């Protein structure tokens, strides 16, 4: 990764909720075009870490350097601008139920980025075609399956041209038969060169698609190494135990 630009650098990140210390000094770096999966047991701090990266949770201490700027110190509109540069896909779909797909996709680019309605619609149709939903532009969320909703949610993030995509267990709320269609979109996105940080329970995705995997347990990084190495030669007893349970 020496020749790849550092997009995010996390230094001694800590997060406390009252007296509960959820993140206990996380340090790691994410590079351009890298796909990193974050795995680990429930309650280990994975989602909190991801939410800290785009300031949905305010870190208690430490630094998050986004293109060299410590975003832990920014306020107001600067936070909004930062979040525009980081797409986020949650477990739940968070689509506007009173809008059809096209309006769900074009509202933010038109209102926030100043894109013309025609350009936004053209871009939306192009992205919908890439995720196999070109025929659903006029549908409302209530008319879509869970897998379709999550693919639309991914497209909505891509409409803002993010530099990094954050995924917080994007398949955990889906029926089993719909998981594959969302993972296929994420795999295509990874192959296109998008920088991605993915909290996931999908071990096959982590092993086969991610260039690197982080094992987060008890608020600390247990292992952080290339995915094939982490899965083939786990070193820590905690990781061995975890993989034996989930593989």
Q: Where does each model-flagged region fall?
A:
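ABC family nucleotide-binding domain
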Residues: 5-227
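C-terminal boundary and immediately downstream tail of ABC-type ATPase nucleotide-binding domains
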Residues: 215-217, 222-224, 228-247
């Amino acid at each position: 990764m020496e020749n790849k630009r550092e997009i995010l650098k996390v230094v001694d990140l800590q997060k406390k909720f009252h007296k509960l210390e959820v993140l206990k000094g996380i340090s790691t770096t994410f590079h351009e075009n890298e796909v990193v999966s974050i795995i680990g047991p429930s309650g280990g701090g994975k989602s909190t870490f991801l939410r800290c990266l785009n300031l949905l949770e305010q870190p208690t201490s430490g630094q998050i350097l986004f293109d060299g700027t410590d975003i832990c110190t920014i306020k107001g509109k600067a936070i909004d601008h930062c979040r525009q540069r980081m797409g986020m896909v949650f477990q739940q779909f968070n689509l506007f139920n009173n809008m059809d797909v096209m309006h769900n996709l074009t509202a933010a680019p038109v209102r926030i980025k100043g894109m013309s309605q025609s350009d936004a619609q053209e871009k939306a149709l192009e992205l919908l075609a890439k995720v196999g939903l070109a025929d659903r532009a006029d549908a409302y969320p209530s008319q879509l399956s869970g897998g379709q909703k999550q693919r639309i949610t991914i497209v909505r993030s891509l409409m803002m041209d993010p530099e990094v995509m954050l995924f917080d267990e994007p398949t955990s709320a889906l029926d089993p038969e719909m998981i594959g269609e969302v993972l296929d979109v994420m795999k295509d996105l990874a192959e296109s060169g998008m920088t991605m940080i993915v909290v996931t329970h999908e071990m096959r995705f982590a092993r086969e698609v991610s260039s690197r995997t982080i094992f987060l347990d008890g608020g600390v990084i247990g292992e952080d190494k290339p995915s094939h190495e982490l899965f083939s030669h786990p070193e820590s007893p905690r990781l061995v135990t975890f993989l034996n349970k989930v593989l």
